[in-house]
Amino acid sequence: MSVLAPPDISGDLLASVATLVLKGVLREWDDVSFVVDCSVMDLIGGKVDGVQLSGAKWVSPLNLTCESLRCDVGAVEIDPIALVSKQAVELRTIPVGDCVVRFNTTDFGNFLVHPEMRRAAKDAGTEWGFDFDFHGQGVVLKDGAVVFSGTRGGGGGERCVVAMRPVGPRSVEVTRVDGPCGDETTEALERFFGELAIDLLGAEVRYGDMVVDDARVTLSLTMRMLRFPSSLQGLI
């Protein structure tokens, strides 16, 4: 009687399953790549030392887009049975890490009007009176700043144009460019981005820092992976 070889439960298997699942969630992509750091024996026990995700030209179902991204998370425990039997990535612990996401002006506009950003703005409005409705059109990169617009209730719904530039970790400076943007509005925007935390399909991401050049905005984010994405969990 022949002895069947055990199923492959290596880091490559986890990377393949994670890639397949994430491609099933995204609407478009040029690249989705995972690199898993673990030994075969550790993964059999559900232990992973770290995971790196890289991607390019992503488009989500709700039109969150980016030129590229790279995320690195540390140690995590997964369910190895679910990985083999269900081809699913089910987390037993919450890994933490960092992401670097690069946006062009269209991407950043899509980010500003994404439902999770609107939810964050609404929550901030309830919590401490934030009052700014972001516009996705007309984003411009100039002199190391992102120039964008929105409307505020205190301004009677008039268009307000501001410039936002990084001034250090978890800190931005917002200045008026045009419209009814007083100190109250610019200071509120500074606080909003400095405290920004949103949930993107299981990943709780927080603003860390930003670099702006003539072609793109590069956001550095910290993250906690609360659950791995699934097409059954909703859209991003």
Roles of regions detected by a PLM:
Residues 1-236:
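Extracellular/lumenal and peripheral-membrane lipid-interaction modules
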